[in-house]
């Protein structure tokens, strides 16, 4: 079996001294990780990316100006030696572990999984001056498209909004009061039954038009949100140093940069020309947009043209994979990641169980 290990991101480079690193997975997860890989100077230590997708084999991944080849799993097995280390850079890490465990030539090879690498809790700062004007109105908006009942678990999260923010107006948006045909992207997503993608645009449009705070229904509020209202706009990092407005974000009515973020979707179609669905997550659009305005994907608090970007601990202490916890005295909301876009045959409960088994293997070393 593979030898599973874990460490902090900033310790990984040191552990690779005199070793050759192979990254398993060259897809979107690896693309999003490019910033972290370059930050800790790992690019020059990567011998190759491994990918099971035949169409990617023989291509290259460019990181920090270095072109890194993509090879097949079988070629990797032939290349491996006593100094080989694997870093799984895919959200399908469980399947990849099973594949490697079945290969006897990989017995004892050191392996790390990116989503399990530990990250420090970054400090957050809030304007607590009593004379500071609250720019964002006391409104909490949420979307529920699809005409189905809201599951009981989510209703419990909604109760937390009322408990900690009793003087806020809570507004539901659905087919009855929101025009999902406003842009082609949402119109196509709605007819494809992809409600989460409808919300990706709708929440930007709603907050720009009315002002307030948006929360996904799988977000639990853990303290009063008033300190966040003193921003013109706020949003937050999630694991991987990506921006996700589904975690919870807010803005004053008519905020200019939010309008620009919304307008991006007018040039995007949900159904591609070949009939396939454009499942690019909102994190890609929103992170790219803010990077073009000067965002640094370092997980630290920053102010970009009136947008306050908070570290992960503020709005997303948990991650989708439920393998890390950055809950702190700076946490306002906790996103529990229903991830309805995650169309896999294995449900999330099964994934969480596998994660616990992986953590146990790491502890056993």
Predicted regions and their residues:
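Glycine-rich Rossmann-fold phosphate-binding loop(s) that bind the pyrophosphate
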Residues: 26
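Short, conserved SAM-binding/catalytic segment
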Residues: 61-66
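Glycosyltransferase-associated regions of secretory-pathway enzymes
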Residues: 2-20, 31-32, 36, 41, ...
């Amino acid at each position: 079996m593979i030898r599973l290990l874990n460490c902090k991101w900033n310790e990984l480079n040191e552990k690779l001294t005199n070793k050759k690193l192979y990254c398993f997975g060259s897809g979107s997860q690896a693309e999003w990780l490019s910033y972290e890989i370059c930050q800790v100077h790992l690019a020059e230590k990567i011998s190759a990316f491994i990918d099971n997708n035949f169409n990617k084999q023989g291509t290259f991944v460019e990181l920090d100006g270095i072109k890194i080849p993509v090879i097949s799993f079988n070629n990797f097995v032939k290349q491996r030696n006593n100094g080989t280390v694997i870093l799984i850079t895919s959200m399908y890490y469980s399947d990849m572990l099973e594949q490697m465990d079945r290969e006897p030539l990989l017995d004892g090879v050191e392996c790390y999984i990116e989503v399990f690498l530990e990250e420090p809790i970054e400090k957050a700062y809030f304007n607590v001056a009593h004379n500071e004007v609250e720019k964002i109105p006391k409104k909490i908006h949420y979307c529920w498209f699809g005409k189905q009942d809201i599951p009981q678990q989510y209703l419990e999260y909604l109760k937390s909004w009322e408990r900690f923010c009793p003087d806020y107006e809570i507004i539901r948006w659905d087919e009855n009061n929101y025009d999902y045909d406003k842009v082609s992207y949402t119109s196509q997503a709605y007819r494809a039954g992809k409600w989460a993608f409808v919300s990706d645009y709708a929440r930007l449009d709603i907050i720009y038009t009315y002002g307030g705070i948006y929360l996904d229904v799988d977000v639990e509020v853990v303290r009063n949100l008033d300190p966040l209202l003193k921003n013109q706009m706020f949003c937050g990092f999630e694991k991987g140093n990506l921006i996700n407005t589904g975690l919870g974000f807010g803005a004053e009515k008519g905020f200019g940069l939010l309008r620009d973020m919304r307008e991006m979707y007018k040039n995007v179609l949900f159904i591609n020309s070949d009939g396939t669905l454009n499942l690019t997550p909102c994190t890609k659009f929103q992170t790219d947009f803010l990077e073009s305005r000067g965002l640094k994907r370092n997980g630290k608090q920053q102010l970009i043209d009136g947008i306050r970007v908070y570290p992960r601990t503020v709005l997303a202490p948990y991650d989708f994979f439920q393998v890390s916890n950055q809950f702190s005295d700076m946490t306002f909301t906790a996103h529990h990641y229903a991830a309805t876009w995650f169309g896999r045959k294995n449900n999330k409960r099964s994934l969480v169980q596998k994660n616990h088994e992986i953590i146990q293997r790491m502890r056993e070393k």
